[in-house]
Amino acid sequence: MSIDLEAIQEMWEKDSKIDRDNLHEESLNIPSLHAKYFELYNTIFLLRKKAEQQRKNIRHERYEYFSGKSDPEVYVENPFPKKIRDKDTMQKYLDADEKLSNTSLKIDYYDTMLVYLESILKVIQNRTYQIKNAIEFMRFNSGLG
């Protein structure tokens, strides 16, 4: 199963709706909703950790490459005529490196997903109060409040 932000948004679009005619069922459904989105949160969190480690590995690999310290075979496949020694220049090359920036973008994407899932989990935690308020409002409207 491929998890992306759009899929999570579509799931939440369906799950966020509260059926006013079945508030008791909606109330009982809160724990399973929480479990569903908390599992997604944990999965994305671990994927982010993995991507963070990949970024560190790629950064080290690219640092070695740009400084001329990689295995000679690497330069046969992908020649790089310079040996960068200056720290500022090295940082510029690392910032512009496609492999490294792709991994950084992946981490940023995971961060966006995590923020979205955190907001969903907060809404789910408050759902009990929303349902309670809806019930009290119905009682009030029917003259029982």
Question: Where in the sequence are the language-model features?
Answer:
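Charge-rich amphipathic alpha-helical interaction elements
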Residues: 1-145
